[in-house]
Structure formats: C-alpha cells, structure tokens
From Swiss-Prot:
InterPro entries the UniProt entry points to: Prion, Prion/Doppel_b-ribbon_dom_sf, Prion/Doppel_prot_b-ribbon_dom, Prion_copper_b_octapeptide, Prion_N
Name of the gene this protein is made from: PRNP
Tagged with keyword Signal: yes
GPI-anchor amidated serine lipid sites: 230
Protein name listed in UniProt: Major prion protein
Binding annotation for Cu(2+) 4: 85-87
Disease: PrP is found in high quantity in the brain of humans and animals infected with the degenerative neurological diseases kuru, Creutzfeldt-Jakob disease (CJD), Gerstmann-Straussler syndrome (GSS), scrapie, bovine spongiform encephalopathy (BSE), transmissible mink encephalopathy (TME), etc.
Region called Interaction with ADGRG6, residue ranges: 23-38
Sequence repeats: 51-59, 60-67, 68-75, 76-83, 84-91
Amino acid sequence: MANLGCWMLVLFVATWSNLGLCKKRPKPGGWNTGGSRYPGQGSPGGNRYPPQGGGGWGQPHGGGWGQPHGGGWGQPHGGGWGQPHGGGWGQGGGTHSQWNKPSKPKTNMKHMAGAAAAGAVVGGLGGYMLGSAMSRPIIHFGNDYEDRYYRENMYRYPNQVYYRPVDQYSNQNNFVHDCVNITIKQHTVTTTTKGENFTETDVKMMERVVEQMCITQYERESQAYYQRGSSMVLFSSPPVILLISFLIFLIVG
C-alpha cells in the first residue's frame, strides 16, 4: 500500500509539472497581430473594416444597416428580422420559428420514485431498507404439482426484500433469517389488506423465493461494504494524505 501511494505521488507530481510548463508558454497570435486589423489598418491585401468602396455602414448601395437595397435590418427585400421576403424570424420563406418546436418529453415521476425507494430506509420498520427489484428465481420443489403452481403464481410473491445493514449481523445466516421474516410479514400484511389470502403452499414457496433473494441481497451488501472499507483504508494511508495535500497546494497556489 505504501509503495502504491509513493508511485501515485510521483505520477501526479510529474503531471502537474507538465501542466505548469504548458501554462507558462506564450500563446501565438494576439490582438492586432497579423490578419485583418481594426479599424482600417489591414495587411497589404487591404481587408479593411469597414470596407472601402461600398458595402460599408450607412452606404447607399452596400449591404449595411438601414439601406434600401441591402440585406439589413428592417428592409423590404433583405433577409432581416420581420420582413415579408427574407429568411428571418417568422417569415413565409424562412425557417420555422421556435414556437413550432416539439416540447421535451416529461420525466416519468413513477420511475424516479421507484429508483429513489430502492436502498432507502423504510419509515416505521425500525431501520430496515428496501432492496432493489429482482427477477424471481427459478426453483424446483420436487414434484410437478408444486412446480406448476409456482410458475402460475410466482407473480404474487415478493420481488424485493427488506433488510438491515450487514454490519449489524455477525454472519450471513442471521442476516438471511431476519430478511426472510420481515419480508414475508410485510408482504403478507400488505396483500391481505387487499383481500387476497395465502395458502400454506403459498407460504412455503414464498419462504424459498425470499430466502434466495435475501442471499443475493447479502452478497451485494457485503461486497459494497468491503469496497467502502477498502476505500477508507486507501485514503487514510500517509502517502495518499501527502499526495492530496500536495494537490490542494497546487490548486490553491
């Protein structure tokens, strides 16, 4: 870990040194260096602004502002704003106005609410969280009747589980046991209030289904918890702290 931090420090120092040298190099071609000059001091080719010999500001035959034959603002034959023959805003021969643009699609608030609910602490359940939706597992119960019954009724069983953080349990079995009990209880109560009852076969199948989902949830949470712990160890090592301090010094300085 210390060697990794030292190599990261060397790499960032070299990178910031190159960036500092690039910032100090002069940029070519400033204002009034080559090309057309402003005003009226052009190159030998004579590209002046305003141009000489017609086309200037306020000239009778140019394309300037307010002229009878130009393409300026407010003219009957120009391409300006609000004209009958021009290509400007709101014209018969021009492009469509912004009023005709289709409105942007609205965000589906139900999808946003569902995404926000996953992984959030559920109120009134003593710190339990609701996991993300899962595909119900394919389970074989040992006989054709139960296998067929499960396939026909699996949509009635939960596809999300309730759980507490993994650091509150000493092992996987305790996590899964608690997860199965609270999930089946909540699903049964919610479904019963809608006028639907579960048979003993339903409860047996729900226990198997929810158990598999709770094991999957435990594996996900354990991996995330391990990654968070590894990140904390990495960023708390002295070489990384020194590197972060050095970067802050470069940015502020």
